[in-house]
Amino acid sequence: MAATKRKRRGGLEVQAKKPKRSSKDAGQPAKQADVAKEAEEENRDRIPGPVCKGKWKNKERILIFSSRGINFRTRHLMQDLRMLMPHSKADTKMDRKDKLFVINEVCEMKNCNKCIYFEAKKKQDLYMWLSNSPHGPSAKFLVQNIHTLAELKMTGNCLKGSRPLLSFDPAFDDLPHYALLKEFLIQIFSTPRYHPKSQPFVDHVFTFTILDNRIWFRNFQIIEEDAALVEIGPRFVLNLIKIFQGSFGGPTLYENPHYQSPNMHRRVIRSITAAKYRERQQVKDVQKLRKKEPKTILPHDPTADVFVIPAEEKPVEIQWVKPEPKVDLKARKRRIYKRHRKLQQKMSRGSAK
């Protein structure tokens, strides 16, 4: 601001004279403008870091690990869930000999209050435990129809570490055990706000749908232009078995009456195939018995020839001259002539000598 000088008598303000700029000072504003432009260009090319204007209050941490004996598809599904949930932690595989309540101690060591544990049995059946450590409750599911991100190759995509929206079927509010599972899934799959590893964006949605007494999981990308949904993956289906009061055990709060174990399912399939085989064998035995039975000859029915029209008799032509024999050219070629016989005799004599 320009300096002002006040007169003593009149009290009027008179602007002070500005000092003259030298040639050195005249070049400084141009240099400052160039520096400002360079700084703007650098800021344009620079990727801004994550914006965090609040405080991280929700300290939910999820432990995701499995037992030994899982196949490659289960391992890929576990890696996909860890990638989609930035608030998750990993651990080494658990031995089959260890009891399930040992997982509560592992959660305490890892400073986690929720757990997703994949339990493999017979190298073909996969079970998922969702637990609130250490006081419970916990739920056990049978995992079916697994499709991983690498297997699906969908067109959707989302930013790594972004926070998802959770969409639930209205049927979750109808029954009390589904309401409990809804709250359970919200606490596990929702990324806490202002988490250090999360990004302040919402660009995908997790959907939980109830169909055929099962929970179907899908992951969709939210497109900014028209708010359309494009599937990303992975996919899996959770078949509820039991809900326990404690963590990995305790009194049973709910048991699914529609659940059928994989062993029983395989047994039913084997019994169906065995019944089909027995039916085929019985049909073959009946056919053999019918072939051995004597055939019953029915008497001729005179009414069967009522609508039969006799054919017209054609005149018979008698040949008085003997027909000429047909010449077989192939037989003539095969015939051995006199000169051929002589050549064969000479060859046989020469070989004998």
From Swiss-Prot:
Q: Where is the composition biased (Basic residues)?
A: 334-344
Query: Which GO biological process categories is it annotated with?
Result: rRNA processing
Q: Where can this protein be found?
A: Nucleus, Nucleolus
Keyword set for this entry? Acetylation, Isopeptide bond, Nucleus, Phosphoprotein, Ribosome biogenesis, Ubl conjugation
Q: Which GO terms describe its molecular function?
A: rRNA binding
Which residues are annotated as modified residue N6-acetyllysine in the UniProt record?
K276
Q: Highest taxon of the source?
A: Eukaryota
**Which Pfam families is this protein grouped with?**
Brix
Q: Where is the composition biased (Basic and acidic residues)?
A: 34-47
Q: Which SMART domains match?
A: Brix (SM00879)
PROSITE patterns reported in the protein's UniProt record: BRIX (PS50833)
Where in this protein does the record put region Disordered?
1-50, 334-353
Which Gene Ontology cellular component terms are annotated?
A: chromosome; nucleolus
**All copies of domain Brix, residue ranges:** 60-249
Query: Does the record bear Nucleus in its keywords?
Result: yes
Keyword Phosphoprotein found:
yes
Q: Which residues carry this modification: Phosphoserine?
A: S261
Glycyl lysine isopeptide (Lys-Gly) (interchain with G-Cter in SUMO2) cross-link: located at K160, K314, K322
Q: Output the PANTHER family linked to this UniProt entry.
A: RIBOSOME BIOGENESIS PROTEIN BRIX (PTHR13634), RIBOSOME BIOGENESIS PROTEIN BRX1 HOMOLOG (PTHR13634:SF0)
Give the family from UniProt: Belongs to the BRX1 family.
**General function of this protein:** Required for biogenesis of the 60S ribosomal subunit.
Name the chain's protein: Ribosome biogenesis protein BRX1 homolog
Species classification = Eukaryota, Metazoa, Chordata, Craniata, Vertebrata
GN (gene name): Brix1
